[in-house]
Amino acid sequence: MPVTLGYWDIRGLAHAIRLLLEYTDTSYEEKKYTMGDAPNFDRSQWLNEKFKLGLDFPNLPYLIDGSHKITQSNAILRYIARKHDLCGETEEERIQLDILENQAMDTRMQLAMVCYSPDFEKRKPEYLEGLPEKMKLYSEFLGKRSWFAGDKITYVDFLIYDVLDQHRIFAPKCLDAFPNLKDFLARFEGLKKISDYMKSSRFSCKQIFAKMAVWNSK
């Protein structure tokens, strides 16, 4: 029986989850909710179901796998990863994954805060100014390794791919000084399951943020 992934009909916090489901060849179906247009941004499609799904902490995204009903995007990623041995093999690797998971979320939220801000045009130059330092940290951590935890891919690579790709869309030249990060993105996109998914009709990554965002909300 396929698992169900529920989220808005955007890229958002579900992109890394979709990629991991595809990579692990997990049978899944999506429940996509549509948000209304400005000025009200009607969310009734989701709100009408929010408290009827048996979720402990109702939110989007959610994953339902039989009796397991999970919210929080990183909890969903970890759940899928545990089933496929993608959570690191040593304590040192697991420590690194914990750090990277939270670092990636920080970077994601920092970009989102700028893109949802009414002062977007004012805040964007300041964010771009600090972006090389952010990318440098990821580049130095990755070094010459294929994946962020070493030679074997883990769930964190899906998170970091998503975050780096968002920034590549936001600032197309932001990775030019970091060839190992560009190689990482190409390596990830070259994985057969990922490549096949990206060529399929199921794949959509155009709209990153919800409709109330100033940047990339269409």
Swiss-Prot record:
Glutathione binds at Y7, W8, W46, L47, N48, E49, K50, N59, L60, Q72, S73. Its main location: cytoplasm. Its EC number is 2.5.1.18. It catalyses: RX + glutathione = an S-substituted glutathione + a halide anion + H(+). GO terms for cellular component: cytosol; mitochondrion. The keyword Cytoplasm applies. Residues 2-88 form the GST N-terminal domain. InterPro entries: Glutathione-S-Trfase_C-like (IPR010987), Glutathione-S-Trfase_C_sf (IPR036282), Glutathione_S-Trfase (IPR040079), Glutathione_S-Trfase_N (IPR004045), GST_C (IPR004046), GST_mu (IPR003081), GST_superfamily (IPR050213), Thioredoxin-like_sf (IPR036249). Conjugation of reduced glutathione to a wide number of exogenous and endogenous hydrophobic electrophiles. Residues 90-208 form the GST C-terminal domain. It is found in: Cytoplasm. This is Glutathione S-transferase. Pfam families: GST_C, GST_N. It comes from the Eukaryota. Belongs to the GST superfamily. Mu family. GO terms for biological process: glutathione metabolic process. Substrate binds at Y116. Keywords: Cytoplasm, Transferase. Homodimer. It comes from Mesocricetus auratus (Golden hamster). GO terms for molecular function: glutathione transferase activity; identical protein binding. It is an enzyme of class 2 (transferase).
